[in-house]
């Protein structure tokens, strides 16, 4: 697929597969940044377990940083997709210009803020005296590359929404390939330990950023990066549409941070660091599922927003059905694999029998409700793509609130291990709620869009 015109003409099922497969592949590969780092870190001689726990504490903070790229990328690409569906090239160009400006501003603000506050944040978010040096080293180096991380993440959405999913996938593959090759060189070859892991990640993000910017400044894309046409109304529109997916990622990070503090509190000095290490391994596995899920639901938003802008209601409905079908197939496969292969995954990080046994249990617990979670992802992202960000936001907040309450309450009655049941409890309840809300709203919302068309034609 080479142009946005295909988004309004090609068979819907073909479009969904053309966008979903490269996007989910890109997200899957993108997860390798953190997993490969953690895999090598876990095998550092003498202090691998402590270094892995330190990296685990940094993980949610790193995700929180890059989620600002998602905020602008998804909000901007949805807005731009609607404008392209309306055949308004000038407005689409303005959206990209304002998005680039916001990515630049967020990069500067986040870099300065996190460098100033990182020591206090790490201790607040679960670092112990033993793990703090490792977490501090990793986060300091990573934060200096915030600009490249946000640009690589945010700009890739604008590549995908213009009908270039394979290019978007290649943007991620460049960074991941570099990370895979450079990690062992910096960590073990140069004997840099956890510092080497962070440096390798930053270099990888620089390469992805350069590729994405070069493509969006080139001749192949219909809508290029320009400078000027800055408008507060456009910025507010982008932020409103991007806030729901941003909240999903940002609060995922905050929940992981909260989980680390709960595990440290209830695990105590004897088990706290061990529980966090096992949670880090299990969370790495979970990312192999949830990141491609984001790729499926987020990567196909361009189909929904373009046809919504063009007022092709039947294509919107058909797209949602096909997106949900792809998602259910993926989550069913991953649920089954989660029953049989966790041990082999855990062995990539550690050979300690106690860590292996408990990490496997956590993985199986985390993934209990992964199939119903398909409905939550597809319907929340679908509502956002159809200019219903407040509804999507409310559903996202509900899931996160349920997770926090469960993580806070369950350990006080059943011990530290009970905190791991917070995820499936929240996933199950929120998925049912999201399905009900979506089915009640979707037809009325699309009918309203059609009536707007008739009024405007008068």
Protein language model regions, located:
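Short alpha-helical transmembrane segments in multi-pass integral membrane proteins
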Residues: 1-23, 80-147, 189-243, 304-369, ...
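Residue-level signal for short hydrophobic patches within transmembrane helices
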Residues: 13-32, 36, 61-68, 144, ...
């Amino acid at each position: 697929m080479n142009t946005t015109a295909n988004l309004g003409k090609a068979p819907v099922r073909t479009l969904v597969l053309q966008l979903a497969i490269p996007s989910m592949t890109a997200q899957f590969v993108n997860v390798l940044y953190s997993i490969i780092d953690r895999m090598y870190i876990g095998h550092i001689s003498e202090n691998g377990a402590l270094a892995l726990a330190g990296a685990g504490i940094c993980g949610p903070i790193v995700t929180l940083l890059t989620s600002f790229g998602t905020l602008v990328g998804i909000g901007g690409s949805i807005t731009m997709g609607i404008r392209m569906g309306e055949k308004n090239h000038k407005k689409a160009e303005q959206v990209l210009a304002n998005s680039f400006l916001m990515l630049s501003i967020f990069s500067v603000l986040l870099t300065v803020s996190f460098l100033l506050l990182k020591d206090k944040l790490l201790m607040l978010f679960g670092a112990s005296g033993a793990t703090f040096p490792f977490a501090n080293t990793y986060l300091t180096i990573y934060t200096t590359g915030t600009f490249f991380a946000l640009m690589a993440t945010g700009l890739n959405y604008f590549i995908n929404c213009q009908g270039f999913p394979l290019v978007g996938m290649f943007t991620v593959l460049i960074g991941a390939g570099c990370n895979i090759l450079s990690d062992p060189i910096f960590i073990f070859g140069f004997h840099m330990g956890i510092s080497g892991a962070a440096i390798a990640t930053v270099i990888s993000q620089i390469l992805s950023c350069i590729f994405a910017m070069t493509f969006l400044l080139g001749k192949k894309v219909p809508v290029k990066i320009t400078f000027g046409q800055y408008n507060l109304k456009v910025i507010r529109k982008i932020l409103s549409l991007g806030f729901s997916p941003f909240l999903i990622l940002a609060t995922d990070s905050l929940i992981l941070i909260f989980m680390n503090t709960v595990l440290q509190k209830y695990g105590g000095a004897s088990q706290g660091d061990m529980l966090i290490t096992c949670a880090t391994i299990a969370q790495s596995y979970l990312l192999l599922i949830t990141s491609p899920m984001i790729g499926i639901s987020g990567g196909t938003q361009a189909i929904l927003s373009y046809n919504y802008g063009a007022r092709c209601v039947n294509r919107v409905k058909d797209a949602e059905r096909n997106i949900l079908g792809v998602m259910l197939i993926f989550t069913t496969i991953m649920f089954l694999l989660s029953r049989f292969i966790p041990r082999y995954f855990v062995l990539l990080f550690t050979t300690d029998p106690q860590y292996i046994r408990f990490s496997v249990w956590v993985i199986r617990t985390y993934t209990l409700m992964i199939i119903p979670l398909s409905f939550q992802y597809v319907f929340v992202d679908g509502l956002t793509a159809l200019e219903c960000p407040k509804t999507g936001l409310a559903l996202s907040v509900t899931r996160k609130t349920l997770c926090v309450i469960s993580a806070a309450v369950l350990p006080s009655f059943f011990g530290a291990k009970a905190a791991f049941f917070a995820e499936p409890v929240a996933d199950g309840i929120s998925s049912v709620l999201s399905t009900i809300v979506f089915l009640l709203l979707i037809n009325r919302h699309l009918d309203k869009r059609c009536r707007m068309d008739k009024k405007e034609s008068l």
